Swiss-Prot record:
Disulphide bridges, residue numbers: none
A Gene Ontology cellular-component term: transcription preinitiation complex
Species, as recorded: Saccharolobus solfataricus (strain ATCC 35092 / DSM 1617 / JCM 11322 / P2) (Sulfolobus solfataricus)
Family indicated by similarity: Belongs to the TFIIB family.
Keyword Nucleotidyltransferase (UniProt): no
PANTHER family in the cross-refs: TRANSCRIPTION INITIATION FACTOR IIB, TRANSCRIPTION INITIATION FACTOR IIB-RELATED
MF annotations from Gene Ontology: DNA-binding transcription factor activity; TBP-class protein binding
Identification of the protein by name: Transcription initiation factor IIB 1
Primary role: Stabilizes TBP binding to an archaeal box-A promoter. Also responsible for recruiting RNA polymerase II to the pre-initiation complex (DNA-TBP-TFIIB).
Placement of Sequence repeats on the sequence: 125-208, 219-300
GO biological process: DNA-templated transcription initiation; transcription preinitiation complex assembly
Length: 309
């Protein structure tokens, strides 16, 4: 098969560069005008297999998957399968099965030897568990894993519970990736209490110099509205209310989730898609008192008139 090659530009020849072609089967550079073989015995550095799509290329590649920060050893080690079958797919006899069990035990011990390995293995399992419960995307879990690894390298986990530091790393990752999750939402899935997670979060920001953007109440609007089954019109109105509140300086020092919840409550009343303060507060992860206070502030300061039933 003949095709143009970028590498042919390095071949010193009077043949015009755009006339040089490469014969992959013969390993030769040829001038298409004169038929002269410019260079031969070229070693093909590419794979011996063919792939026509990126998916086929990835499937046929033998170099393994990319590094995975959510695995304690980043996925670099090998695993002995638990299927108890040989290379031909045949079930192992009882004697071989016991041998495979012993190999697995020793292989696991070899993978997790140091105290740091054991710490990371436990932490990454906890991170995966919380991430799945919160339905977090892989990018956020990867970011949380990186933050936790930095904390381990700096010795910040020593003397603190792994669960609280993992939860704090997840919250920091959500903030960095602008994913609307409150500290209460994350803390409810850990053995640590909210106060401990918040303390670890502040520690990570201070010691690791992790920069997080200021939370925007509008980031919470879509998620809360979707969970409540509200329309796009309600979301749009809630976002407009938040923009007006920002312009009036009402958002400074306020919990963004509480502001978003109050804005959605007002918008749902304006569009006659009524939800109770209790329903909205539960979904937003705030108290009814917070929703009620923010509701009063927004309606009074922005002079929003709520229609009566």
């Amino acid at each position: 098969m003949l095709y143009l090659s970028e590498e042919n530009k390095s071949v010193s020849t009077p043949c015009p560069p755009d006339k040089i072609i490469f014969d992959a089967e013969r390993g030769e550079y040829i001038c298409s005008e004169t038929g002269e073989v410019l260079e031969d015995k070229i070693i093909d550095q590419g794979p011996e297999w063919r792939a026509f799509t990126p998916e086929e290329k990835e499937k046929r590649s033998r170099v393994g998957g990319p590094l995975n920060n959510t695995i304690h050893d980043r996925g670099l080690s090998t695993l002995i399968d638990w299927k108890d079958k040989d290379a031909m797919g045949r079930t192992l006899d009882p004697k071989r099965r016991l041998e495979a069990l012993r190999w697995r035990k020793w292989q696991i011990r070899a993978r997790i030897q140091s105290s740091i390995d054991r710490n990371l293995a436990q932490a990454m399992n906890e991170l995966e568990r919380i991430g799945n419960l919160l339905n977090l995307p892989k990018s956020v879990k990867d970011e949380a894993a990186l933050i936790y690894r930095k904390a381990v390298e700096k010795g910040l986990v020593r003397g603190r519970s792994i669960e609280s530091v993992v939860a704090a790393a997840i919250y920091a990752a959500c903030r960095r990736m602008k994913l609307a999750r409150t500290l209460d939402e994350i803390a409810q899935y850990t053995k640590a209490n909210r106060k401990e997670v918040a303390r670890c979060y502040r520690l990570l920001l201070r010691e690791l110099d992790v920069s997080v953007p200021v939370s925007d109440p509008k980031d919470y609007v879509t998620r809360i509205a979707n969970l409540l089954g509200l329309s796009g019109a309600v979301m749009k109105t809630a976002a407009e209310i938040i923009d007006k509140a920002k312009g009036s300086g009402l958002t400074a020092g306020k919990d963004p989730a509480g502001l978003a919840a109050a804005a959605i409550y007002i918008a749902s009343l304006l569009h006659d898609e009524r939800r109770t303060q209790k329903e909205i507060a539960q979904v937003a992860g705030v108290t009814e008192v917070t929703v009620r206070n923010r509701y009063k502030e927004l309606t009074q300061e922005l002079k929003i008139s709520i229609p009566t039933q």
